[in-house]
């Protein structure tokens, strides 16, 4: 492990992580491919849709916990498929029961099936309820800086604005809003949704995001395991570029070689 990796950790809810890439576990052809892709990504936090993935709800069926053991990964149960605050809160409480008191959750409350944009009113309501109920909430939201700050003030441990619609692969559509959110946040900011390829992930990190969560960008690739590896490298490169500080943009050229002191 490099000195940079040792000193530059992602901290969420009081726990440190080396990897700034968080990955989903859906859309793979089988659990073996899921395991291989997660391992290639280097991710330490994996998110799971409680309403769609078996983590003990259905005894006798393949269980994600068998291929991605919770003593090796931090599970992040999410409320994918919920369209009301009530459903989201109920799903988080079910996850807490299934995972023996686990309180770190990813909250998402969707507005409609076409865009899968977050319903911000329902999201705010669910976040308030869950925080009061002792949950550590990582929240999926729009790229509205005011809303992001409000969710932070409610007590969410991380705010996760979308780059583009879920599963669209369009990349970051509004860099300036993401930058505004990052610059005013006191909690980790992770881009969630819309990443399509490695360069999208690198850009998010170059903007100063603390991490990126993705699923479809890896699972829907022609070679998911190879794409997972590419995303790992992109996250690391983007983070190092952010820490290094990019050169200022200039309108005109600037010669790389000095004019003074030439031989002729």
From Swiss-Prot:
CDD domains: ThiG
Active site positions: 106
GO-annotated biological processes: thiamine diphosphate biosynthetic process
Highest taxon, organism lineage: Bacteria
Pathway, per record: Cofactor biosynthesis; thiamine diphosphate biosynthesis
EC number per UniProt: 2.8.1.10
SUPFAM superfamilies: ThiG-like
Broad class of where this protein is predominantly found: cytoplasm
Any single Pfam family the record assigns to this protein: ThiG
Name the UniProt record assigns to this protein: Thiazole synthase
Higher taxonomy: Bacteria, Pseudomonadati, Pseudomonadota, Gammaproteobacteria, Chromatiales
């Amino acid at each position: 492990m490099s000195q940079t990796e040792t000193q530059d950790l992602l901290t969420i809810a009081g726990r440190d992580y080396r990897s700034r890439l968080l990955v989903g576990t859906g859309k793979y052809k089988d659990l073996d491919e899921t395991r291989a892709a997660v391992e290639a990504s280097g991710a330490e936090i994996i998110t799971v849709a409680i309403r769609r993935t078996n983590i003990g709800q259905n005894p006798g069926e393949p269980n994600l916990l068998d291929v991605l053991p919770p003593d090796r990964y931090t599970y992040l149960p999410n409320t994918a498929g919920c369209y009301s605050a009530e459903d989201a809160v109920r799903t988080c409480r079910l996850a807490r029961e299934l995972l023996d008191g686990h309180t770190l959750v990813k909250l998402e409350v969707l507005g409609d099936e076409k865009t899968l944009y977050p319903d911000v009113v329902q999201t705010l309501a669910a976040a308030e309820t869950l925080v009061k109920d002792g949950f550590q909430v990582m929240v999926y939201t729009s790229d509205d800086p005011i809303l992001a700050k409000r969710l932070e003030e409610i007590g969410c441990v991380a705010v996760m604005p979308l780059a583009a619609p879920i599963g669209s692969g369009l990349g970051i559509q509004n860099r300036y809003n993401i930058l505004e959110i990052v610059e005013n946040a006191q909690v980790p900011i992770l881009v969630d949704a819309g990443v399509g390829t490695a360069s999208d992930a690198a850009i998010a990190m170059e903007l100063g995001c603390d991490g990126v969560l993705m699923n479809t960008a890896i699972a829907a690739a022609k070679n998911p395991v190879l794409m997972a590896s590419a995303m790992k490298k992109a996250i690391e490169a983007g983070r190092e570029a952010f820490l290094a500080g990019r050169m200022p943009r200039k309108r005109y050229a600037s010669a790389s070689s000095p004019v003074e002191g030439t031989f002729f």
